[in-house]
């Protein structure tokens, strides 16, 4: 379910996860928005590919005509700081603040060295961080997820925490966000990989009953 942003939000509708208003648009149905700015995106997309921030109806028309996805997800645009929370085996890890030097956290900002600054633990207030961690854990549990997942959020200037998506297969390079968060609680990249491999070959019950990480932390991504 988590691979589909619209299906994920539908599954989380009756939870305490703070969702951004949206609507699903079929290909061939010209979109009209009651929110400006708004965001047009591929509900099955990743790495911010095919994400358009539209400030006017003309922007929305341009985004629509230049996209070739089967469906579109139209959302109200939320201005704020992006953060991410890793969850592993029902445990949340420190919040990471993501601050692109220009624009938003798009494909270039994600994968070009020096384009984005990361802060872990996040300098945001403990209340905001706790809120994000609680929402991430609730989404993880509601979707019956296991192993590693990473939930992304937007935090407004007023301190509201809005859920963006939860990634069941987050990046796992030495410079990815999950290892970055793990390092903040003393888990090295090799240790993180070892824990992932261990849990991958265990059933949930075996994993929870027979294995405890030596430093007391389950990894996060």
Give the ranges of each region predicted by the language model.
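Short small-residue beta-strand/loop micro-motif enriched in glycine and branched aliphatics
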Residues: 48, 117-119, 173-178
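Active-site nucleotide/adenylate-binding loops and adjacent lid/helix of ATP-dependent enzymes
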Residues: 1-80, 221
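A general structural signal for well-ordered alpha-helical segments in protein cores
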Residues: 5-9, 60, 104, 175-178, ...
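Broad gene-expression machinery/nucleic-acid interaction feature
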Residues: 35-37, 82-84, 150, 163
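Phosphate-binding site of ATP-dependent enzymes
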Residues: 55-134, 155-162
């Amino acid at each position: 379910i988590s691979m589909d942003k619209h299906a994920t939000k539908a599954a989380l509708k009756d939870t305490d996860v703070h969702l951004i208003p949206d609507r699903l648009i079929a290909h061939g149905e010209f979109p009209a928005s009651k929110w400006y700015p708004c965001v047009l995106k591929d509900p099955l997309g990743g790495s911010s590919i095919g994400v358009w921030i539209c400030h006017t109806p003309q922007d929305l028309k341009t985004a629509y005509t230049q996209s070739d996805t089967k469906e579109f997800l139209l959302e109200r645009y939320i201005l704020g700081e992006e953060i991410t929370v890793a969850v592993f085996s029902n445990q949340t890890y420190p919040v990471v603040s993501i601050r692109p030097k220009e624009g938003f956290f798009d494909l270039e900002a994600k994968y070009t060295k020096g384009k984005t600054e990361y802060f872990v633990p996040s300098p945001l207030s403990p209340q905001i961080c706790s809120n994000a961690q609680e929402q991430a854990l609730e989404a993880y549990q509601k979707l019956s997820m296991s192993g590693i997942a990473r939930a992304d959020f937007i935090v407004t200037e007023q301190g509201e925490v809005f859920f963006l998506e939860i990634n069941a297969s987050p990046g796992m390079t030495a410079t990815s966000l999950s290892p970055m968060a793990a390092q903040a609680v003393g888990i090295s990249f090799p240790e993180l990989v070892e824990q992932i491999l261990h849990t991958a070959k265990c059933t949930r019950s075996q994993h929870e009953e027979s294995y405890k990480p030596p430093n007391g932390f389950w990894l996060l991504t």
